[in-house]
Amino acid sequence: RVLFRSDLFGAQLHELPFIWEELNAAGFESGHAYGKSLRTVKSCVGSTWCRYGVDDSVGLAIELENRYKGLRSPHKLKMAVSGCTRECAEAQGKDVGVIATEKGWNLYVCGNGGMKPRHAELLASDLDTETLIRYIDRFFMFYIQTADRLQRTSVWRDNMEGGLDYLKAVIVDDSLGLAEELENRMAHVIGTYQDEWRTAVENPEIRKRFQTYINASAEEQADPYIQFTEVRDQIRPLNEAERSVDRIPMVEA
């Protein structure tokens, strides 16, 4: 499987713009590991490196991630692309999962793992890439516009009157006549994408928010009450019992 996420632990608020500047300069863009938006798209190695792969799952995963990066939604969105039915990328456990077939791509929707796992459902079979992406555009935008706040696609689907048949009718058959509108709205979102790191470091008003102490100088921004210890050649914050902090004694009134 191919999945990349890099965590930088221990950074303080005032340090973030400087870290983002360095990452931007190296060619990185902001991700959304905690936001209500798209996570990195998971992929197996596909036909490029696997004898079982029937299509380029890595290439499609990159295309999908670049298309939907930064997309805001009622809850987090997870996607995966598997290059064959052996399903090494676990696409049938994602909000949107794609599996390669001999005739195209199978599109699965509304799955998730976690505390209440739900198997994704097959929305459409043997799609060419253009049709696949068009259906995903419609699905995501229909979900974003109709789901409740903090509602995953799985719960949204379970609460949907008419179930999968209704969802197929809306997304595939355009039963509500919304397809063009949904696609246009997604095109607008994609066309107005911005790298939030770059925006934050280049916009003085936004950058001013990243200060530990508003009235302190740059040299005085570090929070002295944040203390770390080293574990496995990495740092972690000290817990309450480990911290050496001068405390105000409590006395009876």
Question: Which residue ranges define each predicted feature?
Answer:
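Mobile "lid/hinge" segments at catalytic clefts and subdomain interfaces of large enzymes
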Residues: 78, 83, 87, 92-158, ...
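Glycine-rich loops and low-complexity Gly/Arg-rich segments
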Residues: 24, 32-34, 68-70, 103-107, ...
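Generic secondary-structure signature for well-ordered alpha-helical cores
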Residues: 24-28, 66-73, 137-149, 172, ...
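Small-residue-enriched alpha-helical segments and adjacent helix-cap loops
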Residues: 1-102, 204, 208, 215-221, ...
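Alpha-helix boundary/capping detector
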Residues: 46-49, 90, 115, 165-169, ...
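Flexible, glycine/charged-enriched surface loops at secondary-structure junctions
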Residues: 1, 33-34, 74-77, 145-159, ...
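Terminal amphipathic helices with adjacent charged low-complexity linkers/tails
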Residues: 10, 14-22, 26-27, 158-187, ...
